[in-house]
C-alpha cells in the first residue's frame, strides 16, 4: 500500500496524526452504522460505512460467558463484540453434533452409492480382485472354470458334425463297437459321456468332487475310488455327465487345472470290457 503524505499542520488541525479520521458509530432504530476511513491501493483516502442490524436472541449460558471474556492483544480495549480491525466477519456456519451410532449409520449411507464401484470377480466382495484374500485358491479357479466351461460347451454345440442328427448309443465312442452285437451292453452302461479324473489328493471327498464339476454341467452319477482299509481316496474318480458336450467341456477346463496343490489329469473314460 502506498503511503499517504499529509502536512503536519493539517494533521494537528484535524486532531489526528495517522492521516485518517477516527472511526465513529451510532445507532438508529434497529440498525447500527459504523463509519471508518482507510487508504485504498492507490493511496487515496476512502470512507467505509458498515451497517449492522441489531437482533435480540436467547443464547446458551456458555455463549454469554464467552462474550464477557477479557480481550487481549490488539483488541484489549475493544468493546464487547467483533472489531472490524481485528476480526473478519464471515458466513454463519451451522453445526450438528451427532452420536457415534448416528455417525456410523450416516457414514454407511454415504458409502452406499459407491458399493458397485469395486466388486471382486472371485468372491463378489466389495474390493478389487487383485486384493482378494481368496486369490490363488480353489475359489479363484471357479470363475476361470466357469468361463472355460461355457466356451468349451459353446464350441461343442456349434460343431456341425455333432448336430442335426441322432446318434444311437451303440455307435457313440466307447458305446460297444459297431453293429448290434453289443446293443444291450451299450444301453445298460453308456460311457460315452464319462470322464476319468486322476491325480486327486487323498483327502478328496464326494462333496469336493461335486463342487469341482457342478459348474460345468449336469451329471448322472459319480464314483470316487477309495481304499478299503483307510477309506482315503485312491487318487482317481469317474464322472458321468448327462451330455457329451459337458464332458468335453470338463476335459477342456479341468485337465491341467491346479486343485489342492496337485495338477489334475482329465480324460475320456475308456470303455469297460
UniProtKB/Swiss-Prot annotation:
For this entry, list what GO says about its biological process.
formation of cytoplasmic translation initiation complex
Stretches for region Disordered: 168-192
User: Which Pfam family would be a valid example here?
Assistant: eIF3g
InterPro entries, A to Z: eIF3_g, eIF3g_N, eIF3G_RRM, Nucleotide-bd_a/b_plait_sf, RBD_domain_sf, RRM_dom
Q: Where in the cell is it found?
A: Cytoplasm
- Point to the regions of Gly residues compositional bias: 173-183
Q: Which residues form the RRM domain?
A: 193-271
Give the signal peptide range.
none
Q: Name one GO molecular function term.
A: translation initiation factor activity
Q: Which UniProt keywords apply?
A: Cytoplasm, Initiation factor, Protein biosynthesis, RNA-binding
Q: What is its main location?
A: cytoplasm
SUPFAM superfamilies from the UniProt entry: RNA-binding domain, RBD (SSF54928)
User: What domain of life does the native source organism fall in?
Assistant: Eukaryota
> Is Heme among this UniProt entry's keywords?
no
Q: Which PANTHER family match?
A: EUKARYOTIC TRANSLATION INITIATION FACTOR 3 SUBUNIT G
Stated family: Belongs to the eIF-3 subunit G family.
List the HAMAP family hit by this protein, alphabetically.
Answer: eIF3g
Q: What does the protein in this record do? A: RNA-binding component of the eukaryotic translation initiation factor 3 (eIF-3) complex, which is involved in protein synthesis of a specialized repertoire of mRNAs and, together with other initiation factors, stimulates binding of mRNA and methionyl-tRNAi to the 40S ribosome. The eIF-3 complex specifically targets and initiates translation of a subset of mRNAs involved in cell proliferation. This subunit can bind 18S rRNA.
Q: What is this protein called?
A: Eukaryotic translation initiation factor 3 subunit G-2
Q: Which organism is it from?
A: Drosophila erecta (Fruit fly)
Designated gene of the protein: eIF3g2
